[in-house]
C-alpha cells in the first residue's frame, strides 16, 4: 500500500490528515523548518479562488485532497484501507477525467494534492498528473511505499517539483516489517528508496501505523526515521477498514491508545523531526490538557502547527477521492458521498448532507457532543462509522469523560 494522509499510506494518510499535513492556514514555521510544500511558499487554500468560495458559501474550501490515483499496488499490506493488490482495476479515472476534476477543484481552492494508492508510481501517466496539478496552481505530493524508487524515478520527482513523499515503516526490522507488508525484501527496498529520494533533494515523511503488534516499537521506528535523515515522522492509529478489518483484534485498546498519544506529546518536545500522531484527534485534547497542567498557552510559537489545527478534518478542510472517483471525507470513511464522473467535486463538497453534518459540531452525539474539546478534537468520524454505523456517534476509542458528564465546570 502506498502512504497516507486520508489513509496512512494515502493519508499523509497519506491521507499525508491525511499530511503531509492536517493543518489549517497561517502556519509556516514548522513547514519551513522541516521542508515540504509550505517551505516552497505554498499556502493551501489561501488563494483567491478559495477566498471567493468561502465568502460566497460560508464553507471552508478544502486545503488537502488525498487522491487515490490507482488502486494497483506491488505490496499486500495487512492493514491496507484500500485492500489493494497488484494488477489493473476496472473503472479507474482516466487522465482526462483527472484533469477535468483538477480543473473543477482549482475553481474553488488551491490545495495540496496527496497522490496516493495503491502505489501511485505504478500509474504510467503520474508525471502528467503532477505537472497538470502544478500548472493549475495546486501542490502535488506523493504517498508511496518507496520500493519502486530508483535514481531515475527520484530524478523525475525532483524534476517535476515533488517537495515531499510519505513512506510507511511499521517495524524497525526487516523480518517484522516484511511480514506486515506482505512482501519479503520490502523493508530494505523501502529504506533504499528513502535514501535515493533524499539524495535527489526530495523531502521524506515516515508514517507508522500503530497496532498491538508494534506499539512497543514506536520509539525504535522513530529513531530509525531519524537515522535515515527524514523530515517528519507521523504515527497513524489504525482505523479498521478495508483489509484492516482483519486486524480488529490488533487495534489498541482505548487505554493503550491514550498512553501512546501521551508518550507522543512528550517525545515531540525533543524530537528533531516534525512529529505528530494522525487519525488520532484525541491528541489535540491531550495537548490542551498537558499545556494547562504545565502552565502553558497553546500558541503557534509554543506548539507550531498543532496549535493551528484540529483533530478530525474530514469534510472540513480535507477530502478523499478514490481510484474510481468516489468522494469521501477521508480514505477510512467508508461512505460514498458522490462521484466526480457524475457530479463535480465542488458541488459534492458544497451540497453533500454528510459533509455539512460533519462541519456542524453541535450534531455530535454522546460524549463527543458533550465534550468541551469537541472543537479541537471531534473524535474520529470514520472510526465511529466503522464501529457503530453512525458517523456522528461518540468516538469509541476515547477514554476521556467530559467535564459536563463529571458534574464539573468546563475547562
Where are these regions (language model features)?
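Short, acidic, Ser/Thr-enriched surface-loop or helix-capping motifs
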Residues: 227, 321-322
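Short, basic/aromatic recognition patches
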Residues: 298-310
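Cysteine-cluster motifs in flexible loop/terminal segments that predominantly coordinate metals
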Residues: 364-410
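Short, small/polar residue-rich loop motifs at catalytic or cofactor-binding pockets
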Residues: 312-316
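Conserved alpha-helical substructure of the radical SAM core
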Residues: 2-13, 17, 31-164
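C-terminal accessory region of radical SAM enzymes
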Residues: 201, 255-301, 326-378
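Radical SAM/AdoMet-radical enzyme domain recognition
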Residues: 95-116, 122-253
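A structural motif corresponding to the C-terminal lobe/cap of the Radical SAM core domain
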Residues: 227, 231, 246-273, 308-309, ...
Amino acid at each position: 500500500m502506498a502512504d497516507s494522509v486520508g489513509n496512512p499510506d494515502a493519508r499523509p494518510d497519506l491521507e499525508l490528515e491525511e499530511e503531509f499535513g492536517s493543518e489549517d492556514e497561517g502556519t509556516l514555521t514548522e513547514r519551513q523548518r522541516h521542508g515540504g510544500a509550505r517551505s516552497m511558499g505554498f499556502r493551501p487554500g489561501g488563494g483567491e479562488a478559495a477566498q471567493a468560495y468561502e465568502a460566497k458559501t460560508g464553507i471552508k474550501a478544502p486545503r488537502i485532497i488525498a487522491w487515490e490515483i490507482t488502486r494497483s499496488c506491488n505490496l499486500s499490506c495487512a492493514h491496507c484501507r484500500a485492500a489493494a493488490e497488484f494488477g489493473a482495476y476496472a473503472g479507474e479515472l482516466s487522465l482526462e477525467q483527472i484533469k477535468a476534476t483538477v480543473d473543477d477543484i482549482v475553481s474553488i481552492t488551491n490545495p495540496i494534492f496527496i497522490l496516493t494508492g495503491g502505489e501511485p508510481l505504478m500509474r504510467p501517466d503520474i508525471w502528467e498528473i503532477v505537472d497538470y496539478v502544478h500548472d493549475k496552481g495546486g501542490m502535488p505530493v506523493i504517498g508511496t511505499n518507496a520500493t519502486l524508487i530508483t535514481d531515475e524515478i527520484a530524478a523525475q520527482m525532483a524534476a517535476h517539483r515533488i517537495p515531499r513523499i510519505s513512506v510507511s515503516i511499521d517495524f524497525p526490522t526487516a523480518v517484522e516489517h516484511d511480514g506486515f507488508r506482505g512482501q519479503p525484501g520490502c523493508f530494505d527496498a523501502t529504506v533504499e528508496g528513502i535514501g535515493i529520494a533524499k539524495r535527489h533533494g526530495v523531502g521524506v515523511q515516515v508514517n507508522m501505523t500503530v497496532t498491538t503488534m508494534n506499539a512497543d516499537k514506536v520509539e525504535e521506528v522513530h529513531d530509525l526515521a531519524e537515522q535515515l535523515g527524514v523530515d517528519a515522522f507521523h504515527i497513524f492509529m489504525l482505523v479498521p477498514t478495508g483489509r484492516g478489518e482483519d486486524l480488529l483484534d490488533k487495534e489498541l485498546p482505548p487505554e493503550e491508545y491514550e498512553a501512546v498519544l501521551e508518550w507522543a506529546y512528550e517525545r515531540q518536545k525533543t524530537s528533531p523531526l516534525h512529529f505528530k500522531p494522525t487519525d488520532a484527534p484525541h491528541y489535540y485534547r491531550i495537548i490542551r490538557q498537558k499545556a494547562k497542567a504545565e502552565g502553558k498557552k497553546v500558541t503557534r510559537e509554543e506548539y507550531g502547527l498543532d496549535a493551528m489545527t484540529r483533530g478530525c478534518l474530514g469534510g472540513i478542510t480535507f477530502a478523499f477521492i478514490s481510484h474510481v472517483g468516489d468522494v469521501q471525507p477521508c480514505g477510512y470513511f467508508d461512505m460514498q458521498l458522490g462521484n466526480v464522473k457524475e457530479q463535480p467535486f465542488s458541488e459534492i463538497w458544497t451540497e453533500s448532507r454528510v459533509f455539512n453534518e460533519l462541519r456542524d459540531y453541535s450534531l455530535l452525539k454522546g460524549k463527543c457532543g458533550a465534550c468541551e474539546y469537541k472543537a479541537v478534537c471531534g473524535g474520529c468520524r470514520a472510526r465511529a462509522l466503522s464501529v457503530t454505523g453512525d458517523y456522528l456517534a461518540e468516538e469509541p476509542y476515547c477514554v476521556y469523560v467530559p467535564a459536563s458528564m463529571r458534574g464539573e465546570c468546563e475547562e
